[in-house]
Each structure stands twice: as structure tokens, then as C-alpha cells.
């Protein structure tokens, strides 16, 4: 009974988020949900890691491991095992979900790979950077990235929560493994990464989001 109530609440929350749509946000969140626009930010973060750490290769390999674990657990194991239909494929929600540009995603949605991968990256790099501003920026990005999936109607809130759990677990496992295999790759000081490099990451990330918002404003404003 409680489980069914939770599922119904999950549907109601999804419809509330997805239902608050506008032409501006349709394009905005469609672009936010994509991966290409985040390449500059990812490259800058990798550049800062390589520039700062002598054992950068180990750190990068651990990042790849964290994301790979999150992706495989969510997509290859959990989705087919749980087999929960995405909102866009759920017969009981037919005609209720706002679909953007015909995008409906794959058949199953629990857990969200976007949420798993983004939070794996966010948590692992936060543990490496050990900087509060960076943590706010990167987790803000992960939340925005994950929210876009609900706005587009391809994931329920519980899909996102499950993805966050898988992603954070993967990041912790990768971090502990790195700490055991190559302890010197783990920064011991909060000042290992220069503040100017954190600001550089912030500028690139905010320009990416701001550029999309500004472009949409001129299109729909």
C-alpha cells in the first residue's frame, strides 16, 4: 500500500515538473540534457587536473572507472532488471506527458544513467578538488542536468534519486580504490588546486549555461 502511494506520488511530481513547460524551457532543457555542450567544461576540469597533479593519469583513470561503474550498473544491470517504463512509455500517462521534439528515450528509466554518471563525476572530482566553490558548482550542474530529465518527461523523480545513489556509490568505490592503489594521487591539502583554476572552471561552466539561456531568450523573448 505504501509502495503504491509512493509510486503515485512519483507520477504526480513528474507531471508537475513536466507540466510546467514553456517553449523557452523546452529548448533550454533539451540542450542542458545533451552531452556535447558540457565538453568544454569537462576538458577544462581535466586540464586543471593534469596541470596540478603529478599523478594525474591515476586520477583520470579513477574518474573513468567511477563513470563506467555508474553507467554499467544503471544501464546494463538495474534498468533491465527492474524494467520500469519511462513516463513517455507508460500507457497510463499517455497524453499527459509533454514530449519535447519527439524525444521519448529508451524503454526503461529506473535508474537514470544521466543522474548516475553526473553525480559520479561530481562527487569524485569534489573529493579530489576539496574546494567548496567547486563543490557548489559541480553539484549544481549535476542537479540541473538531472532535473532536465524530469522536465523532458523521460524520468520520474525516483529514477533520479536512484541514479544519484548509484553514482555516489560508484564515486566512493573509485575514490577508495585510488586511495589504496595510489595514495599519493589523493591531495592532502585543500589548497592543492589553485583558486584561479577553480574560477576558470566556474567561468566556463556558467558561460555554457548562460549561453544557452541567452540564446533562448533572444529566440523567445
PLM regions and their residue ranges:
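N-terminal transmembrane-helix/juxtamembrane module of multi-pass inner/ER membrane proteins
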Residues: 1-40, 74-102, 221
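Membrane-helix interfacial "entry" motifs
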Residues: 19-27, 51-60, 151-156, 189-193
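Hydrophobic alpha-helical transmembrane segments
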Residues: 32-49, 61, 114-117, 137
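Hydrophobic transmembrane alpha-helices of multi-pass, membrane-embedded glycosylation machinery
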Residues: 44-50, 143, 165
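Membrane-water interface at transmembrane helix exits
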Residues: 46-50, 70, 74-83, 126, ...
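Interfacial segments of alpha-helical transmembrane regions
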Residues: 46-73, 135-136
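Hydrophobic, lipid-facing residues on alpha-helical transmembrane segments of integral membrane proteins
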Residues: 61-73, 77, 81, 165-173, ...
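Membrane-embedded catalytic cores of phosphoryl/pyrophosphoryl-handling enzymes
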Residues: 98-221
